Amino acid sequence: MTIPDLIALANARLANLTAQRTSAASLGDAVRMAQLDTEIAETEATLAALRGLS
């Protein structure tokens, strides 16, 4: 896989995580929201690192 491919996958993951967080928020699931916030932050950090390589 190339760096642009990995960036595309990370962007897709970020979009999915954001949608899941919106759903968890509408259900009032604070625990799941916190988990997703962590995953979103990790994915954003990965994206930043990948963008630094490209």
PLM feature segments, named:
Residues 3-20, 39:
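Short amphipathic alpha-helical heptad-repeat segments
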Residues 8, 30-41:
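Short, charged, amphipathic alpha-helical segments
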Residues 14-17, 36, 47-50:
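Generic leucine side-chain signal with a strong bias for well-ordered alpha-helical environments
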Residues 33, 41-54:
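Amphipathic alpha-helical coiled-coil segments
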